[in-house]
């Protein structure tokens, strides 16, 4: 056996040992490591609300979900996008960039309806959701989520389209920032203006 072969065998063994010792023993941490960098929406009403600057595709955090309608065929979702006021959802050729499991919402036709709230201080609770959940007691929705950008979405059940709650991501034109050159506030993807904010 040559010196190179012995050196390679020793280094491979050391690398394997270091990798084994540094890998997380907690299965939750292992899953967290595997999904790091992927856009997966969360479902946690205690999650921090992100600040979004410039143009970014981000997952929503579903903070409210309830079924209603005939035979509970409608799934109503409220997904927080970020702290407002944002400029809105980015459009290409007049189509909002909203994805459900990496497909544009338009591929689902009438099974999807939504309203985007940009996070103004005067926005009101979604009237369709308030009406759909009226009479549900503590589960009824009436929160306007002021100063929080969010999306209200209704998904109509179709077993050929949905195998579960879809992963929802949106392409957002982020927070409005002050342009110190003109003393105006508006959307900008200029990194210097975003950093100044």
Predicted feature residues:
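Polar, S/T/G-rich
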Residues: 2-197
């Amino acid at each position: 056996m040559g010196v190179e072969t012995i050196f390679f065998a020793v280094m491979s063994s050391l690398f394997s040992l270091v990798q084994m010792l540094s890998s997380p023993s907690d299965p939750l941490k292992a899953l967290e490591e595997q999904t790091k960098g992927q856009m997966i929406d969360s479902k946690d009403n205690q999650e921090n609300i992100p600040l979004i600057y410039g143009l970014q595709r981000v997952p929503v955090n579903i903070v409210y979900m309830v079924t209603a309608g005939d035979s509970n065929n409608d799934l109503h979702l409220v997904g927080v996008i970020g702290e407002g006021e944002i400029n809105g959802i980015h459009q290409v050729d007049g189509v909002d960039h909203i994805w459900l499991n990496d497909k544009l919402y338009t591929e689902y036709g009438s099974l999807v309806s939504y309203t985007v709230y940009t996070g103004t201080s005067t926005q009101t609770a979604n009237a369709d959701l308030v009406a759909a959940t009226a009479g549900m007691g503590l589960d009824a929705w009436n929160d306007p989520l002021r100063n929080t950008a969010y999306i209200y979405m209704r998904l109509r059940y179709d077993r050929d389209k949905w195998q579960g709650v879809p992963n929802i991501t949106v392409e957002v034109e982020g927070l409005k920032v002050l342009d110190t050159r003109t003393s105006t506030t508006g959307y900008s993807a200029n990194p210097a203006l975003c950093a100044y904010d």
